[in-house]
Curated annotation (Swiss-Prot):
GO terms for cellular component: extracellular region. The cysteine framework is XIV (C-C-C-C). Keywords: Amidation, Disulfide bond, Neurotoxin, Secreted, Toxin. One of its GO terms (molecular function) is toxin activity. It comes from Gemmula speciosa. Its main location: secreted. The modification Isoleucine amide is found at residue 30. This is Turripeptide XIV-18.
């Protein structure tokens, strides 16, 4: 998630922001 400034790996590690990171992570996977 370049916009959020948090890498997908970090998102996966942070369960607290799982919702925000999850959406971002999915977008990255779908985008690629």
């Amino acid at each position: 998630c370049e916009d959020g400034g948090v890498p997908s790996a970090s998102c996966r590690a942070n369960t607290e922001d799982y919702r925000y990171c999850n959406a971002c992570y999915l977008q990255e996977v779908i985008g690629k």
